[in-house]
Amino acid sequence: GCPHCGNNLSNAETEIFNMLSTLNPIQRERTILDGKEIDIYLPSHKLGIEYHGLRWHTDFFGGKGRTYHLSKLNDCLYKGVNLIQIFEDEYMNNREIVLNKISHIVGLDNAKPKIFARKCVVHEITKDEAKEFLNRNHIQGFASASLYLGLKYEGSLIAVMTFLEESEGYWNLNRFATEITHNCIGAGGKLFKYFIR
């Protein structure tokens, strides 16, 4: 929904809009942010979705300034609207992950099989196991860490949480992802509790 890109939605925006059609989304909403456009808006969820094409949103092509997207995010938060920002490269490289995450946020994934964390077991897993899982299920893919934890259900890995020890005694939760084909209820809490112990 960029004025430089023409009046048509991009293929990605159209796909996202169509996926959300049962929730009555609004295209190019301009009233909430006093004239600034939100590409796709879901009034029932107070949720906006912005799709940022890389070419037209770079300074080189006369696009947005460095703080434009942050400013729009802050404007949305001030108005009580959560904003999902999707960059073209993320969508093109991780389309299935992006669509699954949006579907989960708005509650369209209720048909997915549910797995409850209480029926699962936490294991320390190998770097290779974490890498394969995160590259398939996390928008940013794998990142090296100091500790790799996996949640397994009947022997299958359904969630991964990784931690990086920045300095002695100071840990950073580096990555968390669940299997995108399932709803893994309570997975984050169970993995984090294991880490704290």
Model-derived features: positions:
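Conserved beta-strand in the GNAT
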Residues: 155-166, 171-172
